[in-house]
Amino acid sequence: MQKQRFCIDTTAITDTEVRSSLGVDGISESTKIMLDLIADSRVNLGISCHIPYPSVYDELIGFLKRENCPKETIIKVDTWLVKKTPNRYEIKLPAELLYEYIRDIRERINKGMRIGENAMYESASVSYLSIKGCNSNQNDNTKNTKNVDTNATHKEHTDEVLSKTVKSFRNKYRTALRTGTLDSAPDLDVLLLAKELDAAVVASDEGIEKWAQRLGLRFVKAKDFPFILKEYLNTYGNKI
C-alpha cells in the first residue's frame, strides 16, 4: 500500500467523541487504545503519525498529566508519535489565504464588539427595570427605616443581572471569535506540518478542518481515525 502519513492535533487523542466512538469513558483507556493502534500501524504497515513539536506535543502531554494518565501511556506518546517542528521559514502558502484569514478575523472582531455592546445595553436595561420594580413595591411610610435593606436588594438584583449577562456574553463572544477559525499557534502548526509532509490532518476542531480544506489537505475526523487504522490493519496487516 502507498505510505500513509498523518499529522495529529491534540483533539485526535483527547476529544470526547473519540472516547464515545471507542465505547470507553476514561481518557487513559482511550489514549492507550489509540496509541496501540498507531503502534501496530507503524510496525506492520509503516504508517507514521506526526505531532508538531513542541507546541502540540506539550499541549497533549500536559493534558494527559492533568488527567493522571499512567506513565506507561505517556511513554507510548514519545515512542510512537513522531515529533517534528514544522519548517515555518520554508513552507510556502498562497497570499490569498493570509488575506482570507485577516478578513475572517476582522469580521469576527466586529461581531464580538457588537455582542459586547448588546450585553451592556441588556444588563443596563434589565437592571433598571428590576430596581424600578423594587422601588414601586416599597412602602413610603417605612422608606427611611428600610433604606439599607433596599440598597442591599438593589445590589443583589444588579449582581444577579450582571452575572447572567457576563455568562451569556462569554459564550456568545467565544463562539463568535473562536469557533471555525484558527485561534492558537498549535492549530497552525498542525496545518503547516501536514503541508510540509503531505500528510492527512487528524483533528476534532472546526477551525482546523475549515483551513485544512482551504489548503487542499486531506482531513480525517478524530472520531473516525481509530476505525481507519483498524481497516488498514485488517486489510493489509494483522487482523484485530
Swiss-Prot record:
It comes from the Archaea. Its EC number is 3.1.26.5. InterPro entries: RNA_free_RNase_P. GO terms for biological process: tRNA 5'-leader removal. Keywords: Endonuclease, Hydrolase, Nuclease, tRNA processing. It catalyses: Endonucleolytic cleavage of RNA, removing 5'-extranucleotides from tRNA precursor. It holds the Pfam family PIN_5. Belongs to the HARP family. This is RNA-free ribonuclease P. It comes from Methanococcus aeolicus (strain ATCC BAA-1280 / DSM 17508 / OCM 812 / Nankai-3).
